């Protein structure tokens, strides 16, 4: 089911009725809520119509409804919103992201041609990933919106790692092919370790209770794997083909001197390491989930003028139809329950002759009242009185089944109207009654997320347990918020533990050392805790799905830089002192770390303002903040810890 809110401005009473009639003519809209006298639907120069359809927001039927509403925009000042609107991601966002990427690479690369090679390689990987998504049953809007962008920012550092290694090997070896072989060989541990930590971090999302975790985890991990294959196949070929052009287009690029930082890190290794341990301990104990909200971020025009109803659907087995009246009676005692729509309260509602006559006239079904009375008398016979009641369905079915008896009273045009009404009733009935289950649509003035809302849901659940036999289900945004508020801590802890264990194992087998994965995982987890602290300080409320998703992405992606830094240090320590190794590690890794992190921070940070969907924008912004924190820890804390545990890091290996 979908609800569409339509707001039209500057209407007089006649035009309000015209719009109402035009909306009624749109196919697949079954109910329209509007009251010319109510402040609920009229405010200043704004008029609200609430449309209901049985189809989902991403169906062809809803797309056709949106086209019809777009046509009305030509004549009226009209805006509309869906309860769960899905729009295509503009190609301009992808182009904008690649433009930002190109600018950063042009500044940071040592050749004018290198950015083009990077973009071609990652572009091919993104196209393949998007194409293989068609093999999946369904891809969510959130995944579809950010998959390409995240694949771009998560895997660009692998390309930079390989090219930087190739450049280093070229200084010692004149043969291009030999240099590339050595570059692949020496960068392989860092790239494979980095990519697999990213992949397992993303695959951890599969353990989320919500389908979006599985969806996003599969698509992004698949994208990283495809990018990895392209970086070891496509990129080396491009580099070798355009080697001469790369060196002909050589240019100056920013070089960050980290020598003083290296000296500082070694000199104050005890203070920095101790400060880190204390900081981690404090953040672990004070971290909280008060920064989390379970209500989806929204940016709605109509809600600025009209407070939207909070709809909750109760799905129950048809065998409980006799008991459902008790649930309805219970709901009517709550002042914040505005309407209760079921089969019995809509198309299945019973009317006496006067009520039914009035209702049919309102629906432009012109059946003479004498006919209505005669049908009531025929059905009820001796028991007929003014309080006798029938449903519209019963009345119309009687006329259709006995139409030969009404030949003199009902002409062909009227019979056509009756048959049309019968079809509409059947369709409307399907909205409420299925083969096994029926629904109650409860419209309330409760907020989507509040203590009062959760209390209402809790009491309604207890009432259903007492009154209904068999299975029943609740559907709605508030229901999802209610369930997640009860399970979020468990969900967060589960995802954290799974992510840490998987990444720990990958780093363990990458370095064949127990101390290294312990340090690196601890460092990045500290970045996650600091991120939560920053969000708290800024008094932000983060959508719970954003936090769950971002934690896995941060743990899997930013540890790449720590792996790169550690790998360089261990390699250099074979022939150099601690101080020289640390200086050279900074010199060799800073360009890759700085370029890659800059891409991730700026692209996600800027695109967070571009996406129309606030939830997706929020994910981008949190990634940008989290990556910034993680990079600062890697550059200013990790070196001191590495120096402190130098002997264990360099020598403590085990055989795989």
Regions found by a protein language model. Give the residues of each.
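Extended, charge-rich low-complexity interaction segments
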Residues: 58, 65, 363-401, 504-508
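Short, hydrophobic beta-strand segments
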Residues: 2-9, 45-55, 286-295, 310-317, ...
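A structural signal for short secondary-structure junctions
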Residues: 305-309, 335, 422, 430-436, ...
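Membrane-embedded transmembrane helical bundles of large multi-pass transporters/channels
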Residues: 60-294, 458, 467-656
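Extracytoplasmic
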Residues: 15-111, 123, 397-505
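Juxtamembrane segments of multi-pass membrane proteins
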Residues: 3, 11, 31, 260, ...
């Amino acid at each position: 089911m979908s609800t569409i809110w339509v707001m039209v401005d500057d209407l007089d009473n006649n035009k309000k009725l015209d719009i109402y009639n035009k909306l009624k003519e749109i196919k697949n809209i079954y109910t329209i809520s509007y009251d010319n006298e109510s402040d609920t639907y009229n405010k200043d120069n704004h008029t609200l119509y609430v449309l209901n359809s049985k189809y989902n927001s991403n169906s062809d039927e809803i797309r056709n409804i949106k086209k019809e509403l777009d046509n009305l925009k030509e004549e009226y000042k009209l805006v509309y919103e869906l309860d769960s609107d899905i729009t295509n991601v503009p190609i301009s966002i992808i182009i904008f992201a690649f433009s930002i990427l190109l600018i950063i690479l042009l500044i940071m690369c040592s050749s004018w041609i290198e950015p083009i090679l990077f973009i071609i390689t990652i572009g091919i990987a993104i196209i393949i990933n998007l194409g293989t998504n068609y093999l999946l049953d369904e891809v969510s809007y959130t995944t579809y919106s950010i998959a390409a962008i995240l694949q771009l920012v998560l895997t660009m550092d692998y390309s930079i790692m390989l090219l930087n290694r190739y450049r280093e090997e070229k200084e010692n070896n004149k043969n291009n092919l030999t240099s590339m072989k050595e570059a692949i060989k020496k960068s392989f541990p860092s790239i494979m370790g980095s990519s697999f930590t990213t992949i397992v971090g993303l695959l951890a999302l599969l353990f989320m209770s919500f389908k979006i975790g599985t969806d996003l985890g599969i698509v992004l991990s698949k994208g990283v794997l495809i990018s990895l294959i392209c970086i070891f196949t496509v990129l080396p070929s491009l580099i070798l083909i355009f080697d001469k052009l790369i060196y002909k287009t050589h240019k100056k690029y920013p070089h960050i001197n980290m020598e003083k930082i290296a000296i500082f890190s070694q000199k104050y290794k005890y203070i920095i390491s101790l400060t880190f341990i204390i900081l981690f301990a404090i953040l672990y104990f004070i971290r909280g989930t008060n920064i989390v909200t379970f209500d989806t971020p929204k940016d709605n025009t109509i809600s600025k003028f009209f407070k939207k109803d909070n709809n909750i659907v109760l799905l129950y087995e048809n065998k409980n139809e006799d008991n459902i009246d008790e649930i309805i009676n219970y709901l009517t005692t709550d002042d914040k329950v505005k309407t209760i729509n079921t089969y019995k309260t809509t198309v299945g509602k019973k009317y006496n002759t006067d009520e039914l006559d009035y209702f049919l006239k309102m629906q432009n079904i012109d059946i003479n009242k004498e006919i209505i009375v005669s049908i009531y008398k025929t059905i009820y016979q001796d028991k007929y009185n003014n309080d006798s009641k029938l449903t519209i369905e019963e009345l119309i079915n009687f006329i259709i089944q006995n139409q030969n008896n009404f030949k003199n009273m009902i002409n062909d045009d009227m019979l056509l109207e009756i048959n049309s009404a019968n079809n509409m009733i059947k369709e409307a009935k399907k909205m409420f009654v299925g083969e096994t289950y029926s629904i109650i649509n409860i419209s309330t003035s409760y907020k989507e997320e509040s203590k009062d809302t959760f209390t209402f849901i809790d009491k309604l659940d207890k009432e259903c347990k007492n009154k209904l036999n068999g299975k029943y289900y609740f559907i709605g945004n508030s229901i999802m918020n209610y369930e997640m508020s009860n399970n979020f801590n468990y969900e967060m802890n589960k995802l954290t533990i799974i992510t840490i264990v998987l990444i720990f194992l990958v780093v363990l087998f990458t370095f064949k050392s127990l101390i290294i994965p312990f340090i690196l995982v601890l460092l990045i987890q500290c970045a996650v805790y600091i991120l939560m602290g920053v969000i708290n300080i800024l008094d932000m409320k983060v959508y719970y799905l954003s936090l769950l998703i971002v934690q896995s992405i941060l743990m899997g992606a930013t540890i790449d830089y720590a792996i790169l830094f550690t790998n360089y240090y261990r390699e250099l320590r074979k022939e150099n002192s601690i101080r020289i190794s640390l200086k050279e590690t900074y010199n060799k890794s800073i360009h890759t770390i700085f370029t890659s992190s800059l891409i991730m921070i700026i692209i996600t940070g800027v695109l967070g303002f571009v996406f129309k969907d606030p939830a997706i924008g929020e994910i981008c912004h949190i990634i940008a903040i989290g990556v910034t924190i993680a990079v600062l820890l890697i550059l200013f804390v990790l070196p001191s810890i590495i120096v402190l545990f130098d002997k264990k890091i360099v020598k403590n290996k085990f055989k795989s």
